Amino acid sequence: MAQAKKKSTAKKKTTSKKRTNSRKKKNDNPIRYVIAILVVVLMVLGVFQLGIIGRLIDSFFNYLFGYSRYLTYILVLLATGFITYSKRIPKTRRTAGSIVLQIALLFVSQLVFHFNSGIKAEREPVLSYVYQSYQHSHFPNFGGGVLGFYLLELSVPLISLFGVCIITILLLCSSVILLTNHQHREVAKVVLENIKAWFGSFNEKMSERNQEKQLKREEKARLKEEQKARQNEQPQIKDVSDFTEVPQERDIPIYGHTENESKSQSQPSRKKRVFDAENSSNNIVNHHQADQQEQLTEQTHNSVESENTIEEAGEVTNVSYVVPPLTLLNQPAKQKATSKAEVQRKGQVLENTLKDFGVNAKVTQIKIGPAVTQYEIQPAQGVKVSKIVNLHNDIALALAAKDVRIEAPIPGRSAVGIEVPNEKISLVSLKEVLDEKFPSNNKLEVGLGRDISGDPITVPLNEMPHLLVAGSTGSGKSVCINGIITSILLNAKPHEVKLMLIDPKMVELNVYNGIPHLLIPVVTNPHKAAQALEKIVAEMERRYDLFQHSSTRNIKGYNELIRKQNQELDEKQPELPYIVVIVDELADLMMVAGKEVENAIQRITQMARAAGIHLIVATQRPSVDVITGIIKNNIPSRIAFAVSSQTDSRTIIGTGGAEKLLGKGDMLYVGNGDSSQTRIQGAFLSDQEVQDVVNYVVEQQQANYVKEMEPDAPVDKSEMKSEDALYDEAYLFVVEQQKASTSLLQRQFRIGYNRASRLMDDLERNQVIGPQKGSKPRQVLIDLNNDEV
């Protein structure tokens, strides 16, 4: 019997082992792992939007759950891992907590979306949305998705929006309790303790503030009492101060009046001498009145004349001179205007485009300009301006435009300006710009073009007071310079405004050679240009000496004093003319004599305004090594034409925007003291119009150049001598090779370093080679075909 029982128990054990092994085999089914891996891979593809499948999965979850889909990804991954490794479904408590947390996040994301935009989710089928979002690669903000949308739409009528917020908070708390496996009492206890601690700290802070306020009140009361006590004692002190100060106040004006009275008799003759001295010194330059110099006193000579003083021509007024008429300029041809219907259609397209991207805005005004049309957009309340700015590429795509420029906001208005290029740029002529403004009382009034509204823009140079013009090649920079010079010729006589033109490119400004407004012929040599700027600095200093001796502050006051004196005296004295210095290409000057040019520009821009000297600098290379920080900071008015990059735009005007210009005269103008840019379509001026104006001016009066203002002539190389016998050979070698260095001379002539460096110094001093510029090779300034060679 016992053996039979043992056998039966052994059989039972073997059968139970077989059952457990079969269960393990069933539980260890590899299909479960394959499914788990597949789910993980799909979730990863959806989270990072990898490939076609990833975008489809993410768009599907985005449609259903919105922003809360990321929690869905996490919950699916956690559930997959738990079921795969524990081989059982998670506990009901944690499952319920996860579901409650998902619902709470649906409410939260939908509420945030509702409060931010107030736009409802679209009710389109899931598959069509998934296909469209994949096709356009665009995932709009859906808040809580379709599930969150319907949850909010069903809950708001039942418990109101405030009730939904309370329910959402309760759901979040419940999910935390369910997931963390804490009792409600423990959670409530912790929350109450935190609230009590917060209230306790708040009460302590309030009590400290009350104590501080009480101390301040007591301090104020004490100070008031001290002030009252001082006021009671003040009458005696006041009497003493009055007694001591009144005689001083009386003495100072009485003493000054006596000095003025004693000098009043000699003052007219002294003033007359000062102005006569300047008049005679001015006439010395023209060699008209050299005999008046003998009447000057030694004191006047010592105060006015100096070793480096440059005497400016005091040109006698040419009564017969007549400024050129505007009829010399061509009449603008009639052009086809932009269709209003087309503009209104684009305005409607613009509104619809913004609406598609969740921006509620209306087009309130449209301004049609010569080159661009500005659509004035007024966004709805709560819409961020940055949201509109970030859509500039989408707006350009919707309007089929080359590029758009967004001015957000328009200065002084609660609106955003969207500038869209016209299909055809309208030509703006200089004549139509000057027609409404000329003749002007301001002799330095120049025409720039028309703004977005089509209004003509003219600016006075003396209010700028200096101008920087920069832009890439072919953007309209040279036409703008010609327009400025022509505007001056059309408005000012030679004795009123003088010009100094510097043109290292040798082809842009040579047409103006011979006009009577020029101080010196057009300067084309970069070395002479640097010297010419130094002459302008010396002229500026001379004028300030005149202002000092005549007790005037600027050129306007000095000329008024001269006019008054001319009415009283028989001898007429010339007034000081304004001087406009125009540099057409700054980059060439900075390469040859960068330090000298930069120093001269710095001094002119800092001090020359009161002296009536104004500087216009133009360059087609707006880089920081050309437009240095010193030059940029001292030239407040700037014009930026089309450039290739935003970096160049920031170099010119301090902000981006010039990289979006259209070229062909399209510019951004920043005036002195302006915080915003004005977009202007520049006035066009043909070469024939310039030539007609120049011929008209030259026929009336020939140029009368000021010799003392001309740069020094280049030193004759044949007369130059060097102590080294190898100098002539080194000179010829450097000119033939068109390169120079100390090591090159050492190898060629087999000499030491010291001798070679001395030869290099001699060559530089004789202006055969340029100065040393770091690691860059020296520039050879003499051409092989030069007659001197």
From Swiss-Prot:
Biased composition (Basic and acidic residues): 209-231, 247-262
The keyword GTP-binding is annotated on this UniProt entry: no
A Gene Ontology BP annotation from the UniProt entry: chromosome segregation
Residue ranges that the UniProt entry lists as topological domain Cytoplasmic: 179-789
Membrane-spanning residues: 34-54, 63-83, 99-119, 137-157, 158-178
Transmembrane helix keyword on record: yes
GO terms of molecular function: ATP binding; ATP hydrolysis activity; DNA binding
Oligomer and partners: Homohexamer. Forms a ring that surrounds DNA.
Location(s) in or outside the cell: Cell membrane
PROSITE patterns: FTSK (PS50901)
A GO CC term assigned to this protein in UniProt: plasma membrane
Domain observations: Consists of an N-terminal domain, which is sufficient for the localization to the septal ring and is required for cell division, followed by a linker domain, and a C-terminal domain, which forms the translocation motor involved in chromosome segregation. The C-terminal domain can be further subdivided into alpha, beta and gamma subdomains. The alpha and beta subdomains form the DNA pump, and the gamma subdomain is a regulatory subdomain.
Family label: Belongs to the FtsK/SpoIIIE/SftA family.
Membrane topology, record value: Multi-pass membrane protein
PANTHER family the record matches: DNA TRANSLOCASE FTSK, SPORULATION PROTEIN RELATED
Binding locations of ATP: 474-479
Domain FtsK: 454-650
Broad class of the protein's primary localization: membrane
Keywords from the UniProt entry: ATP-binding, Cell cycle, Cell division, Cell membrane, Chromosome partition, DNA-binding, Membrane, Nucleotide-binding, Transmembrane, Transmembrane helix
Species whose genome carries this gene: Staphylococcus aureus (strain MSSA476)
UniProt protein name: DNA translocase FtsK
One Pfam family per UniProt: FtsK_alpha
Origin: domain of life: Bacteria
CDD domains cross-referenced by the UniProt entry: TrwB_TraG_TraD_VirD4
Chain spans, region Disordered: 1-25, 209-275
UniProt function note: Essential cell division protein that coordinates cell division and chromosome segregation. The N-terminus is involved in assembly of the cell-division machinery. The C-terminus functions as a DNA motor that moves dsDNA in an ATP-dependent manner towards the dif recombination site, which is located within the replication terminus region. Required for activation of the Xer recombinase, allowing activation of chromosome unlinking by recombination.
